[in-house]
Curated annotation (Swiss-Prot):
SMART domains: WD40 (SM00320). WD repeats lie at residues 8-49, 50-89, 146-186, 198-237, 239-278, 295-336. GO terms for molecular function: RNA binding; translation initiation factor activity. SUPFAM superfamilies: WD40 repeat-like. InterPro entries: eIF3i, WD40/YVTN_repeat-like_dom_sf, WD40_repeat_CS, WD40_repeat_dom_sf, WD40_rpt. PANTHER family: EUKARYOTIC TRANSLATION INITIATION FACTOR 3 SUBUNIT I (PTHR19877:SF1). This is Eukaryotic translation initiation factor 3 subunit I. It is found in: Cytoplasm. One of its GO terms (biological process) is formation of cytoplasmic translation initiation complex. Component of the eukaryotic translation initiation factor 3 (eIF-3) complex, which is involved in protein synthesis of a specialized repertoire of mRNAs and, together with other initiation factors, stimulates binding of mRNA and methionyl-tRNAi to the 40S ribosome. The eIF-3 complex specifically targets and initiates translation of a subset of mRNAs involved in cell proliferation. It comes from Mycosarcoma maydis. Belongs to the eIF-3 subunit I family.
Length: 347
């Protein structure tokens, strides 16, 4: 496996994200800089500067034209990928903790923090994609959900943008029917009817499969779970010994990659091996751990897999991004024998 070490942040990583082709990698951290990298060699393409606090989240559209970011300065910003120009800024009363483009990239959702008397909320904005008027975006959201119960910390659009899936601080996963032609606003009082208690602690990450029909979650309760996007049925559970911060689904091989480790405040009192700072590979179907890959000097905060499945990137508390390219043996190996390994066209 060929690792590439990327050093472009002064503080711990919060999220890494590949574009659709996988040739670009975007990283954000607890500093105000957004970095763009060439994934094949680790060369830095450029930076996006304008935020005034921790950048919690980032997402790029399917054409690698527009970038959206959320920060602790209570802003969500829209950027032009090619030039680094900030096209528009949305202002909120609290920090923007998670942003995500819809499947057709015509909408963006943002999850805002619950703080200072303000409830946590989820807002959906329609994006004006005309290059001539990029700087003219709607300030008002097309939909607002204010959470009456435990706040949402992560969210994503489900298949065909029919649903929005949210992960909450108490371990619940919820779905909301989304129709941008008939927007709904107000306080959500029906959380119990469209949610399931998937975890016993806060959900730290939620990532969709390639077709968005199921997704994987990671939690501080030391488990990662594979969940159906429509029914919220827990399909598989992957249990570890340490809190998990991120999980991602491999698009071509039957693996789920998870990362986490002992809390950052305790890392100086233990060795790297005891802290469980490795990236872990779990078989998606058999729920068995297949491999571990060390490298970071602290907890792993975020994981993203190349859309073609040929590499993955991880960002840690140590401030580094590691891009690991898989060897041919990874794709040729049959861990459970040829009869139990799915062919690519069957997955």
């Amino acid at each position: 496996m060929r690792p590439i070490l990327l050093s472009g942040h002064e503080r711990s990583l919060t999220q890494v994200k590949f574009n659709r082709e996988g040739d670009l990698l975007f990283s954000v951290a607890k500093d105000p800089i957004i970095n763009a990298w060439f994934s094949h060699n680790g060369e830095r393409l450029g930076t996006y500067e304008g935020h005034n606090g921790t950048v919690w989240t980032v997402d790029v559209d399917s054409t690698s034209t527009l970038l959206v970011s959320g920060s602790a300065d209570n802003q969500m910003r829209l950027w032009e990928v090619a030039t680094g120009k900030c096209l528009f800024t949305w202002e909120f009363t609290t920090a923007a903790k998670r942003v995500a483009f819809s499947e057709d990239c015509s909408q963006v959702l943002v999850v805002t923090e619950q703080r200072m008397g303000f409830r946590g909320s989820l807002r959906v904005f329609r994006i004006n994609r005309d290059p001539a008027t990029w700087t003219q975006q709607d300030v008002e959201p097309t939909r607002t959900i204010t959470f009456s119960g435990p706040k949402a910390v992560v969210a994503a659009f489900a298949p065909c943008d029919q649903y929005i899936v949210t992960g909450h601080e108490d371990g619940k996963v919820a779905i909301y029917y989304h129709d941008d032609k008939e927007p709904e606003s107000g306080i959500d009082a029906e959380l119990e009817e469209n949610s399931t208690k998937a975890h016993t602690d806060v959900i730290s990450d939620l990532q969709m499969s390639a077709d968005r029909t199921y997704f994987v979650t990671s939690s501080r309760d030391k488990t990662s779970k594979l969940i159906d996007s429509k029914t919220l049925q827990v399909i598989k559970t992957y249990a570890t010994e340490t809190p998990l911060n991120s999980a991602s689904i491999h698009p071509t091989k039957p693996f789920v990659i998870v990362g986490g480790g002992q809390d950052a405040m305790n890392v100086t009192t233990t060795s790297a091996r005891q802290g469980r700072f490795e990236t872990r590979f779990w078989h998606k179907v058999f729920e068995e751990e297949c491999a571990r890959l060390p490298g970071h000097f602290g907890p792993i905060n975020t994981i993203a897999i190349h859309p073609a499945g040929i590499a993955y990137a991880s960002g840690g508390e140590d401030g580094y991004v590691r891009v690991n390219w898989f060897d041919p043996g990874f794709f040729n190996s049959k861990l459970y024998g040829a009869d139990l390994e799915l062919a690519l066209e069957d997955q």
